[in-house]
Amino acid sequence: MSHKILLVNGPNLNLLGRREPSVYGHQTLADIVAELNQQAKLAEVELEHIQSNAEFELINAIHATDAQMIIINPAAFTHTSVALRDALLGVAIPFFEVHLSNVHAREAFRHHSYFSDKAIGVICGFGSQGYEFALAAAIKRLNQPQ
C-alpha cells in the first residue's frame, strides 16, 4: 500500500449508536470504521484510526503520523480547540473535516469551526456516509499525479 490516511475521531464519538440516534444515526463507530477499512482496502490505501475523548491524545496521534492525508471529525473540539487546529497546521498534512449532522442546522454555537477555513473540504449532514465521501475524495487526491 503506497498511501496512508489517518482517521481522527473526537470526543463522544465512542457513543455512536446509542447517543442521540435521531441526530447521529444508529451505526456504532466500530461499524463505520469497519466499512471505511473495506473501502480503503479496495483502493489499496492504509487507514489508521484513532478516537479519543482526550484532546492531547488526538494531538499526539497527528504529530506522530506518517499519513499523507487526514480525515477528522473533531466533534465538540470543532468549536473549541485551537490546539488541535495548530497540530494539523503544524504537520502540514492536508485534511478533510467531517460531521455526521448538519452543524449549520443546529445550535448557533455549533456553526463555528476552528478547522473549516484550513480544510480541503467540509462534509456535514450525511451521517456516516460523509466519512465515505471524505475517504473517496482523499483517495482521489492521493492518486492524482503530483
Curated annotation (Swiss-Prot):
GO biological process terms held by the UniProt record: amino acid biosynthetic process; aromatic amino acid family biosynthetic process; chorismate biosynthetic process; quinate catabolic process
Alphabetized InterPro entries for the sequence: DHquinase_II (IPR001874), DHquinase_II_CS (IPR018509), DHquinase_II_sf (IPR036441)
Residues binding substrate, per UniProt: N73, H79, D86, L100, S101, R110
Active site: Y24 (proton acceptor), H99 (proton donor)
Catalytic activity: 3-dehydroquinate = 3-dehydroshikimate + H2O
Superkingdom of the organism of origin: Bacteria
An example molecular function term from Gene Ontology annotations: 3-dehydroquinate dehydratase activity
Alphabetical UniProt keywords: Amino-acid biosynthesis, Aromatic amino acid biosynthesis, Lyase
EC number: 4.2.1.10
EC top class named in words: lyase
Positions of the record's site feature: Transition state stabilizer: R19
Pathway field: Metabolic intermediate biosynthesis; chorismate biosynthesis; chorismate from D-erythrose 4-phosphate and phosphoenolpyruvate: step 3/7
Function in brief: Catalyzes a trans-dehydration via an enolate intermediate.
Similarity annotation: Belongs to the type-II 3-dehydroquinase family.
Subunit field text: Homododecamer.
The protein, known as: 3-dehydroquinate dehydratase
Species, as recorded: Shewanella baltica (strain OS223)
